[in-house]
Amino acid sequence: MPRSLKKGPFIDLHLLKKVEVAVEKNDRKPVKTWSRRSMILPQMVGLTIAVHNGRQHVPVLVNEDMVGHKLGEFAGTRTYRGHVADKKAKR
């Protein structure tokens, strides 16, 4: 269920401050964050945000289509290696 419009988007304050500093300085280095729950705002477009997936930081280049989504949607936490092949079926 989506968040109520009267509440507005959620973003952690520490991430918002990092984004504002990066925009001010025109910094191209990735902004490192553990906040997967924060929503992508229009001022983040063009920035690279390194989102933690539980093991490492995954670089996510934010574009206009991502606005309104959560950061965690773009950094998967599970690795799918496929189903194990049956040895009898190979013969």
Curated annotation (Swiss-Prot):
The lineage of its organism: Bacteria, Pseudomonadati, Pseudomonadota, Gammaproteobacteria, Pseudomonadales. This is Small ribosomal subunit protein uS19. GO terms for molecular function: rRNA binding; structural constituent of ribosome. One of its GO terms (biological process) is ribosomal small subunit assembly. Protein S19 forms a complex with S13 that binds strongly to the 16S ribosomal RNA. It holds the Pfam family Ribosomal_S19. Belongs to the universal ribosomal protein uS19 family. One of its GO terms (cellular component) is small ribosomal subunit.
